[in-house]
Amino acid sequence: WIASQTHGYETVAFLSRDGYLPMKAYQIACRYCKELPQAEYLYSSRKALLPEMIVTENDLYDIPVEYHNHTPRTVLDLLSFCTKEYTDKQLKNDGFIGHKTFATRMEFNQFVRYVIEKLYDFESHKQSSDLVKRYYAEKISDKTIAFDMGYSGRIQAAISRAVGHGIDVLFVHGDSK
């Protein structure tokens, strides 16, 4: 299926982590069909692409996490690319317990508001975004098609934003979210 969809491309970028085994199978096929585009494994975790997933401060409310599995500390770890240094004492003084999981969406949203007002660092975010853009600009050209197992398409949208143009993607699974 992948081979039949890649005519005109030079590279198939298999997105980590789900793309690893399909890439290995594709590489076996490439041994027997030399005209297939080359395979490349492309690091593409949500955490690595967060600088491009978060375009405005309001996007912080929609970071790709299940809030009830996270604490202020774990959220700040994810957002370390765009937040100032903090201490547990500072969090506590401002009404948050660093290791306590969020019980409700409202509690999570209150913490995000706090991050925006007190800890968000635009300049750090810009530097991280520039780094992501440089990485993907070196890896993705208009002759590259990406392969991913699928789901929401947020990873591909972030990569497209990073490289400054839409990327073609082969999905195995789509999600309506």
Predicted features along the sequence, with ranges:
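Long, low-complexity, Lys/Arg-enriched
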Residues: 1-177
